[in-house]
């Protein structure tokens, strides 16, 4: 039996929170020069991608404004092309895409819970 979408959405939020925690006080230069922060955030992006892949098709179809395929594709790239990871692109994802993802996932959870 497939888990409720809220389980996977909460996994996404947990990973987003960890990424925010790991990078909140970092400059881009600090991030780019520190493999520990890179590895920690890449792992959380992988989890976000895996959770996205497990969301029901009906949920993904209901929220087409989210680039679900791109999120899952980022996970695949990080898993399968780990020697070719563009750390600058990871930083851009953290600063540009993660905040937007957090906002929409919170809205989706509210919608699923029946809260306006």
From Swiss-Prot:
Alphabetized InterPro entries for the sequence: HepT-like, HepT_RNase_toxin
Highest taxon listed in the record's lineage: Archaea
Cysteine disulfide links: none
Secretion signal span: none
Keywords: Hydrolase, Nuclease, Nucleotide-binding, Phosphoprotein, Toxin-antitoxin system
A Pfam family that the UniProt record links to this protein: HepT-like
Keyword Manganese assigned: no
The keyword Nucleotide-binding is annotated on this UniProt entry: yes
Active site feature: 75, 80
One Gene Ontology MF term: RNA nuclease activity
Top EC category: hydrolase
GO CC annotation: toxin-antitoxin complex
PTM per Swiss-Prot/TrEMBL: Modified by cognate antitoxin MA_1295; probably at least 2 successive AMPylation events occur on Tyr-82.
EC id: 3.1.-.-
Motif RX(4)HXY motif mapped to chain: 75-82
Residues bearing PTM O-di-AMP-tyrosine: 82
Protein role: Probable toxic component of a putative type VII toxin-antitoxin (TA) system, probably an RNase. Probably neutralized by cognate antitoxin MA_1295. Neutralization may be due to AMPylation by MA_1295.
Protein family: Belongs to the HepT RNase toxin family.
Subunit relationships: Homodimer, probably forms a complex with cognate antitoxin MA_1295.
Protein name: Putative RNase MA_1296
Organism from which the protein derives: Methanosarcina acetivorans (strain ATCC 35395 / DSM 2834 / JCM 12185 / C2A)
């Amino acid at each position: 039996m497939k888990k409720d979408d809220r389980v996977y959405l909460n996994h996404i939020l947990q990973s987003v929170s960890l990424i925010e925690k790991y990078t909140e006080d970092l400059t881009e230069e600090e991030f780019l020069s520190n493999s520990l922060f890179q590895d920690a955030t890449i792992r959380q992006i992988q989890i976000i991608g895996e959770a996205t892949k497990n969301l029901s098709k009906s949920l993904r179809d209901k929220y087409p404004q989210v680039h679900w395929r791109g999120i899952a594709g980022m996970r695949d790239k990080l898993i399968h092309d780990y020697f070719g990871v563009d750390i600058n692109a990871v930083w851009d994802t953290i600063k540009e895409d993660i905040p937007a993802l957090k906002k929409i996932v919170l809205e989706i959870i509210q919608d699923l819970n029946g809260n306006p």
